[in-house]
């Protein structure tokens, strides 16, 4: 496990923090939010994914969300999945509950090829979106959420696989 420090953490967000480790993008990587817990089985499943972009999602989210927040119809980590298991949209604020297939967990796997795609998209958009919204969150590119990055990948035609778990 390697740790990286984003010296600009106070004026940026998670994607820019993630990209401080770009010198390590020479093989597949697992990326995890620092505030989540997951089982070894979940980690192994993610590690064994053959997809370029793999995202752990919780398909059994409603009970937990109701308990935690008292409602289930808000958030920016909701997502929709097509019949082949690929995410078609995510990060929409307050989507209709019947349009939520799962919730984003914060555990991802990117192949080496995927990492190069991420850098290409990031570098192409970086200057243009310094002072205007980049994706659905309305944040500038330096303050982008990981869901913004995933949404950018989907918009650019990349296939982002939802790796489903019950609980997450």
What do the PLM-derived regions correspond to, one by one?
Residues 1-28, 140:
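Conserved N-terminal catalytic core of the sugar/cofactor nucleotidyltransferase
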Residues 14-15, 36, 143-148:
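Conserved glycosyltransferase catalytic-site signature
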């Amino acid at each position: 496990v390697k740790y990286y420090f984003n010296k600009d953490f106070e004026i940026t967000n998670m994607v820019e923090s993630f990209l401080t480790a770009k010198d390590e993008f020479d093989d597949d990587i697992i990326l995890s939010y620092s505030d989540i817990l997951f089982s070894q089985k979940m980690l192994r499943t993610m590690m064994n994914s053959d997809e370029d972009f793999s995202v752990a999602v919780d398909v059994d989210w409603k009970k937990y969300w109701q308990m935690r927040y008292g409602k289930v119809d808000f958030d920016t980590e909701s997502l929709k999945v097509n019949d082949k298991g690929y995410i078609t949209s995510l990060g929409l604020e307050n989507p209709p509950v019947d349009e939520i297939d799962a919730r984003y967990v914060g555990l991802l796997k990117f192949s080496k090829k995927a990492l190069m795609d991420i850098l290409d998209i990031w570098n192409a958009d970086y200057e243009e979106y310094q002072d205007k919204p980049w994706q659905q969150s309305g944040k500038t590119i330096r303050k982008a959420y990981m869901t913004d990055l995933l949404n950018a990948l989907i918009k650019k035609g990349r296939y982002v696989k939802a790796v489903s778990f019950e609980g997450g």
